[in-house]
A protein has these predicted regions:
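Alpha-helical, largely C-terminal catalytic domains
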Residues: 1-192
Length: 192
């Protein structure tokens, strides 16, 4: 790959740092798509002993790349995203993949096909962590930024995706305990 082609990729993926997500960080600013993907990758890494038979490299690459389409569309919260939004994001993502140098295009296309099919343990882990990371970030941020529909969403988002394995099911249950603590804290504020 030429330095020019390499830098074109690097400049494009920089957009993940610029695109903000719906969640607010503890510092009072919105999380970026890059931060979300980065933490997902680390979450996967620290679960490696729980999943000794999975291809960790594929999981890490999926985690880092899974929201690449949002470079072009921005992040649309799950409760607002339509089928048309998803189709447009996939179309733009696929155009980006097609422009990658051949060996990378094939590998990245394969990763997205695997994630879209949701048949492998690797893809299921990534989907569960994607949902779980969003809930954890909401728990860590200011709950006063939550929309009314998010109180229920915090308890249910990603529960189904985590249920395929006891490890992630148990982890998601612990995340729900944190959700309950955050909501209980808000309820105490209202009582004062």
């Amino acid at each position: 790959m030429s330095p020019k082609d390499y830098l074109a990729i690097v400049h494009c993926i920089a957009g993940l740092k610029e695109r903000t997500r719906h969640a607010w960080m503890t510092s009072g600013r919105q999380e970026s798509v890059a931060e979300h993907s980065w933490r997902m990758a680390l979450m996967a890494y620290f679960l490696r002993d729980e999943f000794p038979t999975v291809d960790l490299t594929r999981v890490l690459l999926m985690a880092l790349l899974h929201d690449m389409g949002e470079v072009f569309t921005g992040d649309i919260p799950t409760f607002e995203k339509t089928d048309a939004d998803r189709a447009r994001e996939h179309e733009l993502r696929d155009e980006w993949i097609d422009a990658l140098p051949a060996p990378y295009a094939a590998e990245v296309r394969s990763l997205f096909a695997e994630m879209d099919a949701m048949e492998t343990e690797e893809a299921k882990i990534v989907k569960a962590l994607d949902r779980m990371e969003a809930v954890i970030t909401h728990n860590e941020g200011d709950p006063h930024t939550w929309l009314p529909l998010e109180y229920d969403l915090q308890r249910t988002y990603g529960v189904k995706e985590a249920a395929f394995t006891p490890v992630l099911k148990e982890l998601r249950a612990e995340v729900n305990r944190e959700v309950d603590e955050v909501i209980a804290g808000l309820n105490k504020e209202t009582e004062l």
